[in-house]
Regions:
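Mid-core helix/loop region of P-loop NTP-binding domains shared across ATPases and GTPases
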Residues: 1-6, 37, 54, 76-167
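A short, basic N-terminal segment
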Residues: 1-36
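Pocket-edge positions in alpha/beta enzyme catalytic cores
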Residues: 12-16, 73-76, 97
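Phosphate/oxyanion-binding active-site loops and adjacent basic polyanion-contact surfaces
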Residues: 16-20, 49-50, 80-81
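Conserved helix-loop functional segments at active or binding sites
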Residues: 30, 63, 94
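Walker A/P-loop nucleotide-binding motif
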Residues: 34-56
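Conserved catalytic segments around the Walker B and adjacent sensor/switch elements
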Residues: 39-41, 63-77
């Protein structure tokens, strides 16, 4: 079946990932009560279903509410703070972002999220060239869940303490 071969295809059911999806849903659940969610670190071998399971949770979240914005970023494709902040703006529907500085774009994101919540999923985090955006989100966005996906569980050990302590 052709759609199943499409990289962005999300099946109706993600077999053998129900437990992981329940854990992630538990991290997001406080956002429904206008509280900050929990953060998560997801790791495992390539091809075991991490990305598709998380995207399924985001898809269900998008169908359920407009008050929580699901944001998925592939850090292999966007690996600098500016690229990631600009991509978040695009996913949030913020316009006229060209030729704007990172700080200005981030201010827009904060302003837009002052009345809503967000789930940030950063996939392939081990491909990042810089982590300033992560500190900014962890420190300055109120109601959020941050989910980091990688193939390497050791990656988290390399994080700066100022970021690790906020996860």
């Amino acid at each position: 079946h052709e759609p199943a071969l499409d990289y962005s295809f999300i099946p109706k059911i993600v077999p053998y990932r129900e437990k992981e999806q329940r854990i992630i849903a538990g991290c997001i659940k406080p956002l429904f009560d206008s509280k900050s969610g929990k953060n998560a670190f997801v790791y495992g071998q390539p091809g075991v279903g991490k990305t598709v399971a998380l995207n399924k949770v985001l898809q269900e979240l998008e169908e359920e509410t407009d008050e929580i914005i699901p944001i998925y970023i592939n850090c292999w494709q966007r690996n600098t703070t500016y690229q990631i902040i600009a991509e978040i703006c695009e996913k949030m529907g913020l316009k006229f972002i060209q030729n704007k500085r990172t700080e200005e774009l981030f201010r827009w994101i904060k302003q837009d999220l002052s009345k809503k919540s967000a789930v940030f999923v950063f996939d392939e985090v081990d491909k990042l060239q810089e982590l300033d955006f992560l500190y900014m989100i962890l420190e300055e966005i109120g109601r959020k869940s941050v989910i980091l996906i990688t193939n390497y569980k050791e990656w988290i050990l390399e994080l700066e303490d100022r970021i690790k302590s906020r996860l």
